[in-house]
């Protein structure tokens, strides 16, 4: 209801729904067992019904739990699949960045896997032929 009012008021000022960003407020899963499912459903509705972009503090979901990174790394690709368009995360955690990239690949956001390949392809060793180097290593 609140997001719908925001979109309506934004339209009064000529702001298109796709230029509005809504934060559905991620709650800690340790306190509310269905917090993940609630935010996935809300993001789907915000995207399909209101056509707005979404963001969140993604690590809120794991607040108060041990080994938070495991939950966060699983949560982000699921958010992407639900339609989340941005998230506040720590870009210094390589596993988290990899999880985001994987989510983009698996949902077709990274069409042709070009960003994934660019980030993770094995570099050629000195003197290797670009057409044969990796193939030979795979056979070995």
Regions found by a protein language model. Give the residues of each.
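Catalytic alpha/beta core domains of metabolic enzymes, predominantly
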Residues: 1-128
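Terminal or standalone catalytic/regulatory effector modules within metabolic enzymes
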Residues: 124, 129-140
């Amino acid at each position: 209801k609140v997001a719908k009012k925001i979109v309506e008021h934004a339209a009064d000022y000529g702001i298109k729904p796709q230029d509005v960003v809504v934060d559905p407020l991620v709650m800690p899963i340790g306190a509310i067992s269905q917090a993940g499912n609630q935010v996935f459903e809300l993001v789907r509705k915000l995207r399909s019904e209101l056509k707005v972009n979404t963001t969140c503090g993604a690590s809120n979901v794991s607040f108060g739990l041990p080994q938070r990174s495991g939950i966060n790394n699983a949560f982000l690709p699921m958010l992407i699949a639900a339609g989340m368009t941005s998230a506040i995360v720590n870009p210094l955690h390589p596993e988290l960045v990899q999880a985001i990239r994987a989510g983009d690949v698996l949902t077709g956001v990274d069409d042709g896997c070009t960003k994934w390949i660019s980030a993770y392809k094995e570099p050629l060793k000195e003197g290797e032929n670009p057409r044969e180097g990796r193939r030979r290593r795979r056979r070995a």
